[in-house]
């Protein structure tokens, strides 16, 4: 089978969570980033006439120049620009919809390495753009790329965009208001900010609502975001909590842009997004906040979560991976709670428009305070099916159905496992990876089939 070369730029910029890539390389080279800003600015000026865009960023060393290039592109289309500086992704979403901005842009690659970066766009309502709108913007970006002179895109601009501290404080105040009146004085929490965007916000929230907070990984260098810390490595905080001999009630870890959170209980056991969905769903149902008695999870959520929710009279629906797609399903069904195993949780009863790691942490603490129980006690009946995830680096994202050996391995696994397991094989929307996820009652069969499928992918399109 001949495979398409990856040397030439592919005209497909947006993945499941905006545009991502290696900073400095297409599509995150200065020329293309400028064109992205110009295309978005032109679209907004046509729609709003006097358009203003809010830009926020994480702590990667490339985030400054990408923000500047975007700002120059926007301003070249006569679109106004404001900056929130280093701030979380959900912070930009909140401020965009509450402060009258025409759109919000986040410069971040979330959990990716520091060498990567990305661009996420929110509409004036604080929601991520639909796939259809992203496709329209792509066409405009390529038009501007062809029209622009490279010298214009690489012109001079400010050394950095000054961030507005008032904007960050407004967002922090909203977060605090979500748990107003709750007594958190008995909680002692370890917070891992991943040397990322949470470093600029978390200290404005947790201590001020009464949580005894110890912060770690809050000294970003531009190159240490997500490095052996945060939600990408929750075992680090979990180990610290477990060895603290009761000093901490739980650990909380954020990823680079703090749109998700993972936890560890007082014994140092890692608690993922599935468990958070379970405890939040039960609490919301008891208070009459769980509309339709429904939770929206994804294809990656464990079968054990579905069983535990069913025992509580709660229906679970599965959406495609990506909090954007979870939100779409929530809107369709009227659900007020949804999320991913990775820790993206959406609380529609808090009027949130995207996953928010800090809000999730506050809501979990609120459930603990309300119930008087520990995190471990609240999720004790969650019996997780054995699950394995294998990541395979690929040189091209060929549709699986066009890879006969891979399809044969998948079909063999599905036939062997039957109703006692699940097989999900998909490409990452943000990296050049194929992900193989298998759940099964039999760990031996699970690992056997995961290895067979991963090897078939590696042989067909692996790097």
Swiss-Prot record:
It catalyses: alpha-D-glucosamine 1-phosphate = D-glucosamine 6-phosphate. Its EC number is 5.4.2.10. This is Phosphoglucosamine mutase. Its cofactor is Mg(2+). Catalyzes the conversion of glucosamine-6-phosphate to glucosamine-1-phosphate. It comes from the Bacteria. One of its GO terms (biological process) is UDP-N-acetylglucosamine biosynthetic process. The lineage of its organism: Bacteria, Pseudomonadati, Acidobacteriota, Terriglobia, Terriglobales. Belongs to the phosphohexose mutase family. Keywords: Isomerase, Magnesium, Metal-binding, Phosphoprotein. GO terms for cellular component: cytosol.
